[in-house]
Amino acid sequence: MPKITESNLIAGVQIVEPSMHGDERGFFIETYRREWFPLGREMIQGNRGDRKAGAIVGLHYHLHQADYWYVPYGTCRVVLHDLRTGSPSDGVTQTIDLGARPDGTHDHRGIFIPPGVAHGFASLTDMTITYLVDNYYNPNDELGVAYDDPAIGADWG
């Protein structure tokens, strides 16, 4: 069973540390399971993005879509900013590094991002990100905030 913790900065953001099983042949890891998020909605689409080191993607947000991100290769810095009026963490910014660590290990954490939380990432190395979403693409629910907005004050690495 994975260890799932709620962010201590942004309400509703959940960080998953999945269990890993392996031997000299390699390893197996379950990166997502619906039952881990009993209050979440069903993820209906999976996507993959490959980025070169130095790329910045975001910030964007959705009013009607949650995301679940996992980085199987490389390292990224995830930047989150709570835009939900009335949320206990409204206006809070958080950064989380996912993927490979400087010591050569890989943390294998995933992150659940609820609707209304702006999200983006900087590729600290060449990387791959997979993301599951609970709604199909809707251009009317693709909203954005400038990645360098001083009110957000994000550290992109």
Range-by-range predicted roles:
Residues M1-D107, T128-G157:
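Non-catalytic, conserved peripheral segments adjacent to functional cores
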Residues T105-T125:
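Conserved SET/PR-domain catalytic core that frames the SAM/AdoMet-binding pocket
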